[in-house]
Amino acid sequence: MNLNLLPDLALFVQIVDQGSFSAVARQNGITPSAVSRSVSRLEREMGCKLLQRTTRKLRLSDAGETIYQHAQQMLEAARQAMDSAGSRQTVAQGKLTLSVPKAVGRFVIHPLMMAFFHRYPQVDVCLRLEDRPLDFIDDGIDLALRITDTPSPGLHGKPLMPIRHVICATEAYLQQHGTPYTPQDLRAHSCISLGETPADARWKFRREGKTETVQTYGRYAANHTAVRLDAVRQHLGIGSLPLFTAREALANGDIVQVLPEWEFISSYSGDLWLLWAGDKHMPARMRAMIDYLSETVPALNAGSTEPAK
């Protein structure tokens, strides 16, 4: 085997996964023609066509499918070898990629990173803020945080803290428009919801075993918690917010919780889980981040006012 083709095989796997020469070129900082030449070298060496290209998509030949599967196994073996070497290190060092939901990354994880860097000066972190399913191997993820009650089978992990939601407004808004005392009172208010589906405007509450649902209305909706928080601060209405987003503004008195005696039930609630793909040969940097987040994230809930249960 020509070992000089190993980089081409790695690039070939990326091409198949991405389905685009140009996407792979951008990802690797090379030109599409360089990607095309890489495939041509492989096809010359293998003596067969690996990819069928059309104007819209790439299709693997039978030989290409076989090569792709073996190349994937080769890359996974290489990753395991590197992780195995890293697990023998006693000092946490190297680059770690951490994938987190956008709002959690902005309000929970990013504020903790400066202290992490101080504690572990030889660890570099790539914090990826993304709200999508992921594949630890294909996406190059070391650790991930996800809000779920049922982590995917095959993953290892631990819950760090519950994610609860509250509804909030400013004192100025409530003085002008009145304070709601029951969920049904919200019908007379401008409510700021997530806005991704019609169900996001149907707010559900629970108190002493009783559940109430109210159809809310408002001139503004936004699918990012920071935007909804800012809208609430600007007196635009009563907004639904994760408690981790609202906590600082509540503590400062910038906003107040509305209907605090009712539990606001959100379909986006659950536990914040720290997840990883395997326990074998774990690099010291991964263990350091797991230990650090296990220590610091649960502490964020200490002393905070949770919604009524």
Curated annotation (Swiss-Prot):
Parts of the chain that traverse the membrane: none
Among InterPro entries, the record links this protein to: LysR_subst-bd, Tscrpt_reg_HTH_LysR, WH-like_DNA-bd_sf, WH_DNA-bd_sf
- Residue ranges of the annotated DNA-binding region, renumbered to this chain: 21-40
Citing just one GO molecular function, the answer is: DNA-binding transcription factor activity
Q: Name one Pfam family in it.
A: LysR_substrate
Q: Which UniProt keywords apply?
A: DNA-binding, Transcription, Transcription regulation
- Asked whether the keyword Aminoacyl-tRNA synthetase is assigned, the reply is no
The name this protein goes by in its record = Probable HTH-type transcriptional regulator LtrA
